[in-house]
């Protein structure tokens, strides 16, 4: 009904300004004309309600006629309803409202357009000297009379520039149009309200009253902030140097007088319960938005400049396209259509065909509403868990990026694939929700069209919210780019532009408005209530448990205060309640996201301590009842750790009567041999050697494994060596077992020992390549500059993968290693690239 103006920016007077004497006062704002820069102090004015209805203020001729017109409409309404019936009267005032609404949005819009671009009204007044006492034409005399009858006796027309006087006259015609617009609309609504409204629409009536009261607060608070100057489009006529405070309602919503300032329209529609009133209200509201778009916004941008601020995320989107030839803007599902469709991207076809398949399946096979409900429920739970899990693991360990890096892909490629997965999940879940809602709607026995229209309004609200979010944070933010491409962020500062100026997390509630709209459309179907609750809970959980912890980690702990929060926190009861809820919420989030052990007394055990414990336990199990002349020790007997690939030397000694030429020694994992110390019940898998060179001549055992064999009187002793050809290439605790004859009977068990991976330096690509080259040469698995997996049956590519990970902390997949033919130079370079990416993500 009443419009909003953007509060004026402070303007410092320029040089050469003319000063009109006798009007400037320090306590009042200074204004100046748009052309000529003539400075003056605006006279005090009053808002429309006081001007028209305050009996202590002077009334002009037009103001009296406006009051009379309001009263006449009320009397006319009563007379016509009595004489011609409510139906005819309602149509009469509907068309009258349409006329005045067009006078407002089209008439005033055209006048302001010409005033903004050509100062038409001001030039007309100057050319005809409308405010000069020398001009005695009827129009000039009427204009002077109108202003003098309105303003105080001390007001002198000729001391003020034409711009200000024209603005005062313009206000009178604005008051006439706005009051007629308001009065005719109210009378139309009153005639549409049923007599049983209180008994049959109690909830709707209560909600409607709340919306009307909220509308009143918006109007009052808006006028408190912008005053008469902006309320009546003063900057179309002159500029005012005043510093206005952006608070209250202007922190709650963009263009509050055009958006939430029309909440009363919808409140009255609820009270009336008539969908025709709602449609009329929507039409009037839509005209107001058109007025904003084609009249106000062009003037605002011309006078104050565009509100558009450089978007860091948009720069990142451009950078990704420029630096990565294979990257293109991702497919985004927006409502019922797609944007950024790439004709050469197969995933786009896959997404679109999936939607088409689901729709065709639903319309041709006609599944039951219950079946569609379960399909939607399962799809939403599955996709929400998948999205939340991926984002959580990506935030805590960069899991998704590492997954692609270790398989030879780039960081940007991982983000590219995530964009497809995220959009695909959203598309499938919302497609099923729309089809489920349609199926439920078709089976309704009765339809409340007012409720249905409100449902579609909520769907439009979610669509608008999504568009505003996408505009504010761009595609980079829409797809959670700060989880995947943290190194692309130049400014670690939260975005507070666009919709984020008013709401910190608009997607939390406005992002599910359409789901609750579906509840209204289906007349509060239990199925849709469950789905809407699920959508809301999933959104809140994602924001609280995943997004907010990650935002704190990336952007710091400074909280982004939204305009709505600032306004609501101005009310003490709400502020206190919010503090209590924040404390409860913090405890819950900490409990759900804590990785600490539930037993505080249970201290974490280091890896080294765990290994030592394992060795000690194994030592206690070694056979201790051998004859005193039997020996079986490793090396010098003091070392219990060997670096792969060894060698591991074992010295043994037996009485001659116990020795057999077919005795053999095998290498085993301690945990695989079990508690049986008398007999080995697991295979050595070829990791064994005889005790003398003459034994097992056809076994293919390497002769070099027998270092020493000697008979001395009543004893036999020797030394065997387990080198790279007989070695385990896996960290762990091992033991050697001496077996009697060609059997698995155990005579002696060595002290348990630990096999550890070699230390390979990885400070640079060259250093890592050289270390790998040296190790592979030691184990005779080097073929040129590459690892040969066929050279050693025990040394596989998985060991090489583990060695690289231990040396550098970087995980490369076996698939990738095979793809590059195990080239150690490429491995070194790739590891450094991945390390650089992961370091930048921290």
UniProtKB/Swiss-Prot annotation:
Example of a GO cellular component annotation carried by this entry? endoplasmic reticulum membrane
Its family remark reads:
Belongs to the class VI-like SAM-binding methyltransferase superfamily. CHO2 family.
Q: What does this protein do?
A: Catalyzes the first step of the methylation pathway of phosphatidylcholine biosynthesis, the SAM-dependent methylation of phosphatidylethanolamine (PE) to phosphatidylmonomethylethanolamine (PMME).
Q: Which residues lie on this side of the membrane: Cytoplasmic?
A: 82-91, 194-196, 265-270, 367-370, 436-468, 536-842
- A Pfam family this chain is assigned to: PEMT
Name of the protein described by the UniProt record? Phosphatidylethanolamine N-methyltransferase
Q: Name one GO biological process term.
A: phosphatidylcholine biosynthetic process
Where does the UniProt annotation locate this protein? Endoplasmic reticulum membrane
Which portions of the sequence form the region Disordered? 1-28
Query: Which keywords belong to this entry?
Result: Endoplasmic reticulum, Lipid biosynthesis, Lipid metabolism, Membrane, Methyltransferase, Phospholipid biosynthesis, Phospholipid metabolism, S-adenosyl-L-methionine, Transferase, Transmembrane, Transmembrane helix
Q: Which residues lie on this side of the membrane: Lumenal?
A: 1-60, 113-172, 218-243, 292-345, 392-414, 490-514
Q: Which reaction equation describes what this protein catalyses?
A: a 1,2-diacyl-sn-glycero-3-phosphoethanolamine + S-adenosyl-L-methionine = a 1,2-diacyl-sn-glycero-3-phospho-N-methylethanolamine + S-adenosyl-L-homocysteine + H(+)
User: InterPro entries annotated for this entry?
Assistant: Phopholipid_MeTrfase, Phosphatid-EA_MeTrfase_fun
Protein's UniProt keywords contain Magnesium? no
Q: What is its EC number?
A: 2.1.1.17
Q: In which pathway does it act?
A: Phospholipid metabolism; phosphatidylcholine biosynthesis
């Amino acid at each position: 009904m009443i419009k909003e103006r953007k509060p004026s920016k402070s303007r410092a007077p320029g040089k050469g300004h003319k000063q009109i004497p006798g009007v400037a006062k320090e306590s009042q704002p200074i204004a100046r004309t748009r052309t000529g820069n003539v400075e003056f102090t605006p006279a005090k004015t009053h808002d429309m309600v006081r001007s028209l209805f305050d009996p202590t203020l002077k009334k002009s001729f037009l103001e009296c006629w406006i009051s009379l017109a309001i009263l006449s409409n009320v009397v006319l309404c009563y007379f016509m309803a009595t004489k011609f019936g409510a139906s005819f009267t309602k149509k009469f005032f509907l068309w009258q409202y349409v006329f005045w609404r067009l006078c407002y949005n089209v008439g005033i819009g055209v006048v302001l357009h010409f005033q903004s671009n050509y100062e038409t009204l001001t030039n007309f007044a100057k050319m005809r000297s409308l405010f000069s006492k020398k001009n005695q034409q009827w129009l000039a005399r009427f204009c002077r009379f109108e202003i003098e009858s309105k303003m105080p006796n001390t007001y002198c027309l000729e001391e003020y520039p034409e711009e200000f006087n024209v603005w005062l006259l313009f206000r009178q015609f604005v008051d006439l149009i706005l009051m007629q617009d308001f009065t005719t609309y109210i009378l139309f609504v009153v005639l549409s309200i049923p007599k049983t409204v209180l008994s049959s629409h109690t909830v709707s009536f209560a909600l409607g009253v709340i919306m009307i009261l909220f509308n009143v607060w918006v109007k009052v608070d808006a006028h408190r902030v912008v005053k008469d100057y902006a309320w009546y489009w003063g900057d179309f006529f002159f500029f005012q140097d005043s510093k206005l405070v952006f608070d209250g309602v202007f922190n709650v919503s963009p263009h509050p007088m055009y958006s939430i300032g029309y909440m009363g329209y919808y409140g009255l529609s609820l009270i009336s319960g008539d969908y025709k009133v709602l449609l009329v209200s929507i039409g009037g509201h839509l005209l107001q938005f058109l007025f904003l778009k084609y009249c106000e916004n062009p003037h605002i941008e011309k006078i104050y400049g565009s509100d558009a601020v450089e978007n860091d995320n948009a720069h990142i989107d451009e950078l990704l396209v420029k630096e990565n030839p294979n990257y293109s803007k991702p497919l985004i599902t927006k409502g019922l259509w797609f944007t950024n469709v790439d004709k050469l991207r197969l995933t786009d076809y896959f997404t679109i065909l999936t939607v088409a398949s689901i729709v065709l399946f639903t319309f041709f096979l006609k599944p039951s509403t219950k079946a569609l409900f379960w399909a939607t429920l399962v799809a939403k739970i599955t996709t929400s868990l998948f999205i939340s899990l991926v984002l959580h693991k990506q935030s805590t360990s960069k899991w998704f990026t590492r997954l692609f890096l270790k398989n030879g892909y780039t960081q940007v490629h991982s983000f590219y694939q995530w964009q497809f997965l995220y959009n695909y999940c959203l598309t499938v879940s919302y497609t099923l929700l729309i089809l489920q809602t349609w199926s439920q709607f078709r089976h309704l026995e009765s339809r409340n069209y007012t409720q249905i229209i409100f449902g579609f309004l909520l769907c439009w609200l979610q669509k608008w919210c999504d568009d505003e979010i996408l505009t504010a944070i761009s595609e980079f933010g829409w797809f959670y780019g700060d989880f995947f491409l943290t190194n692309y962020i130049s400014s670690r500062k939260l975005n507070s532009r666009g919709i984020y100026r008013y709401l910190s997390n608009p997607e939390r509630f406005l992002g599910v408005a359409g789901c609750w709209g579906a509840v209204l459309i289906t007349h509060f179907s239990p199925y849709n209530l469950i789905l809407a609750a699920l959508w809301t809970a999933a959104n809140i959980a994602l924001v609280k448990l995943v997004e907010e912890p990650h935002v704190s980690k990336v952007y710091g702990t400074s909280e982004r205060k939204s305009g709505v929060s600032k306004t609501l926190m101005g009310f003490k009861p709400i502020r206190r309640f919010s503090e209590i809820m924040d404390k409860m919420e913090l405890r819950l989030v900490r409990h759900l996201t804590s990785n600490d052990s539930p037993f505080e007394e249970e201290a974490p055990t280091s890896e080294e301590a765990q290994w030592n414990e394992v060795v000690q336990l194994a030592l206690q199990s070694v056979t201790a009842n051998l004859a005193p002349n039997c020996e079986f020790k490793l090396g010098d007997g003091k070392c219990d750790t060997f670096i792969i690939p060894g060698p591991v030397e074992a010295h043994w000694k037996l009485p001659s009567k116990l020795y057999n030429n077919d005795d053999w020694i095998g290498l085993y994992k301690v945990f695989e041999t079990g508690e049986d110390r008398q007999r080995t019940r697991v295979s050595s898998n070829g990791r064994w050697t005889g005790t003398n060179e003459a034994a097992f001549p056809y076994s293919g055992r390497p002769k070099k494994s027998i270092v020493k064999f000697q008979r001395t009187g009543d004893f036999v002793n020797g030394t065997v060596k387990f080198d790279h050809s007989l070695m385990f290439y896996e960290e762990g605790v091992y033991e050697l077992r001496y077996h009697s004859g060609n059997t698995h009977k155990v005579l002696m068990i060595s002290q348990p020992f630990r096999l550890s991976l070699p230390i390979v330096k990885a400070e640079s690509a060259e250093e890592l390549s050289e270390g790998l080259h040296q190790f592979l040469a030691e184990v005779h698995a080097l073929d040129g500059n590459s690892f040969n997996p066929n050279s050693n049956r025990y040394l596989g590519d998985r060991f090489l993968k583990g060695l690289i990970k231990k040396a550098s902390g970087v995980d490369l997949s076996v698939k990738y290693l095979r793809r590059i033919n195990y080239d150690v130079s490429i491995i070194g370079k790739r590891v450094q690239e991945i390390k650089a990416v992961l370091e930048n993500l921290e």
